[in-house]
């Protein structure tokens, strides 16, 4: 017989009245629940035993039949079947309604499904259903139209006029008739025709109507089933009534709602029998409709029906939705048995894989195991006695407990479980007391500390569960962070301080030499006797260095002796970063078990020597640099100078503010550097505060700055920086105004933390919901697409090297050495650490790789596109739930980011603006391109953006007279190739591979060409083919203003600059100067303020459009030289770079929201020109090289980034503002959008120092791009504007093409994560996410089938999840022995034989004793 729980898919449909009656075991006719005297259910009431089953096990209501042997008998007296009381959880009843009523979900939920089918507005539909208006069902040959609404008077007039020539009705009955009369096939044909006519102009409503009609046609549901004539009554044990202590009853709200329905229904039947007046019956029908509405969805009704305690009653819909609903509360999150929780304390004596479990807890958790063991060992004869023994806590129990607990893992969990390392398995060690002991190194993955945190313990029961704990979940197998593959288990705080102190080296006095020792033992004796210090430099022969003499310290020898012998000699000062690198090196190059042993050794040494060091803090350790006073005076002078420039009218208010902030930021930074140097010199580098910060044990440079430097600039709650800095530090103490400014930041930190934690949690939830069904499910999808990877740079600084980005992925194309063309990587080759480094060393610029974004697996992803499983440092296995890991990896730091603000105490962390272009390495300039003006001093002033092309110089060689060069200019040169012969016969070889450039008497070896942007207004001081040493200024500019410069000599002429309409003149009260500012606020006037430069005869040489807030710097008619500043635009005022901007930004990107002030992007590449105004917006035209023009509308208030005659690329911004991802998709396509999103999201996290691997972000972005929008239907079944899954779209197109038809065309769609999660194939998963009613309504109409492919839907229905060993492909695995015999069958045979033998033995023993045993 097939198991009811064994099914592969689940379908939801509308129930017809007959189906509802078929479910039912009887009709509920009375509103009574239970009898107040006997407390037994009333007959035909809401708890009736005849309908729903007996309340007493194997007994009928009247007690005539009492026993399991009457199972299935129906009592002739009371009519109750003798059965188990659990049937009261599954048997349903029904209520026959006196008049049909509408189901609230189908007419009230937006968009109204009934309204769409009948083409009626919700208001009209409502007025019919609530008996306010009549609707024409059949107009006959009258002037009335079908579906026309009539008021009472209009209906009466029509009756008089036409008599019985037409049919009209009101209420659900009328709507039912209309729905019954619908011909769906004709309707859909008519609607599709309408769609074809309208084409692109068709509205969303039409698309929705077609979709709904199609759904009804395909699913086999009938539209009239949305009207109910019979209501199901859910089983009584799902709406229980419980007696409280005081004899009162608590009941489920559903009983009240059902009672109202039954009351009104009975009253309506009575009124109809009495032939009451129409108006009364109509009112009663309306009330019945309202009662049924409230039963199904009380929250939608306004006002909601309230109960006795004046709170709205919980209807069936409310039971399902929300955090406390059935889905999230009971199906996705269940309380589990065999669990406990307690406070955690640190357990430094434990091994990494152990945890301390209180004996009291273990006794309760392992109770059944102990009882079984007691019976097995024959300490007691049966389970009952064993239970008593355990409850008495007798000594025998404890001896058994040790055996039971030994090698039985437990799982520890700390809420919130933000990523998979929030639950790990440990081997329990029994401890005294009531607190769980936790190994200090696993605090990081759990994010636990010991300030009162609690943790939960769970016991895995089955053999398979225990096996999983040992092999997969044990803490020593989870050393790497799944988000980025770095180690997550590493020493911190005290341990780091101890290790740093132990391995630090004291500098020797001048002229002194390190003492020599012959062996480690000798060094240890000398150190213990105090002859040398632990940090003194010594020379010793050491076995890890093949007995060679090494210069080291006694402390480092201690460390090397304690760690496992296989680990190479560590001879450096260990701070937190180096410790982490050391662990990673051992883990990746040697062995994970070795890394575990080393971690435990490092923990022990760290604690020992932190105690030994005995770090203390005193006021004298906080040293304020002596130069602080002079530095503050210098800064004050600079601020005064800026103020006087402002008063003189040379700079604007915004520039003044920006420059003041810049001065203080710089001063604060310089003071911090000086302070750190002072601390480093103090006590020969053993200043406690300095050690704590540099070792990374506690505190940061920023915090020490506040203690001993100056607190610096603070931020207002809005994020603006207060230009008045706090000059004092905490040692000197703050004055009143400084203290007052500080309070802002401190409060904001706390408020932010509280608010943002919830946001981060919600972000994780949405991410999990969109990615939960992505599982690795095949080896290779066979795609030919991929993405090009390069190193991530910020300016010249490499943030993430190419090796770091490509490691752990598969190649898409061959990778060759750029100079020798030697094959480095083949197609579809896995890139491990060695290969990645080899590629980087070869100087490869970019590699094309396979990525999750381009994976073509229909469901989930394939191994080759995913690559490495970061948590295990191995290639991912089939069955890995990568979607959930990706969601957790992005969501988990989100929560960390929110907590970040308040540690600094609100001090502003603004980045200092650069005002020059310099390079940290020597370069050779190739060319400088862009519009510029030659200045008198020979420099070039750029009047628009330009580009500098250059090569990085790798080596240079000076040629002497007579040297013969052996390479050509610009030729490719390999390492060790001959460059030139000198006059004295020597040969000079190339030290590196590169390109040769011969300029004058120098040979340069340079790298590939690079380029950097030159800002508008920059003064470039170098020329083409010039060699620029590192640090030399290439160009200077003003970072705070965006100038518009004259490009020719000539005279200034104003156009459309009219005082009072486009020009405002203001007298600045602080400076007394007149400031002239452009404004475009007065709309309606078609004016475009601009400045012309003309020659003497008035011919225009150049024109400049002026944006809002531009400051005029020249008078009309003035003569100007090329390069004069005509107009200045202030750059935006500085804000602090804080993650509070980060989390909403991540949310905005993942939700695919259009930014508030999105920039207008150029739709094609071409030349810009301006063509007047349209509705108060500028028309910017871009003409491509075929002469085709594309118009763009730009608001007058926006600052233009292009000028007349500029060349732009497609997708380039025409005005200021953020990029809109939807525009990027439309203009540049899917790949560009993917790159933009990946970079933006990564940058937000990178600012906070959080690294997330691309594959995680890529997985989520891929899910957001799953759908496409149909733009041309062809011969397919699609509708214009329909949103279809990519794979379904391609499948349908293949089908049509095979039949020789015209395929459909679609454009890619970019959906936010919430929308994408709701549009997922699985209705169970979508319903458990959000908008439960809406999802279920749509699914029921469409007769949706859930194939149970995701994780969530399987958890909900209680199946194994289709990931890991639960994948369907692994469920049919059978084991065979060498002779191909089924091992399962053999095992069953062995067990059967054993049982028979045991039974025979038991009988023999019983026969010998002559009587059966006692209670066993």
Curated annotation (Swiss-Prot):
Catalytic reactions of this protein: RNA(n) + a ribonucleoside 5'-triphosphate = RNA(n+1) + diphosphate
Cofactor(s) named in the record: Mg(2+); Zn(2+)
Residues engaged in binding Zn(2+) 1: 60, 62, 75, 78
Record's cofactor remark: Binds 1 Mg(2+) ion per subunit.
GO molecular function, one term: zinc ion binding
Residues bound to Mg(2+): 449, 451, 453
GO cellular component: a single term: DNA-directed RNA polymerase complex
Documented EC number(s): 2.7.7.6
GO terms, biological process: DNA-templated transcription
CDD domains xref list: RNAP_beta'_C, RNAP_beta'_N
Keywords: DNA-directed RNA polymerase, Magnesium, Metal-binding, Nucleotidyltransferase, Transcription, Transferase, Zinc
Domain of life: Bacteria
Residues that hold Zn(2+) 2 according to the record: 781, 855, 862, 865
Top EC class of this enzyme: transferase
HAMAP family per the UniProt record, alphabetical: RNApol_bact_RpoC
Function: DNA-dependent RNA polymerase catalyzes the transcription of DNA into RNA using the four ribonucleoside triphosphates as substrates.
Family, per entry: Belongs to the RNA polymerase beta' chain family.
Subunit structure: The RNAP catalytic core consists of 2 alpha, 1 beta, 1 beta' and 1 omega subunit. When a sigma factor is associated with the core the holoenzyme is formed, which can initiate transcription.
Name by which UniProt lists this protein: DNA-directed RNA polymerase subunit beta'
Gene behind the chain: rpoC
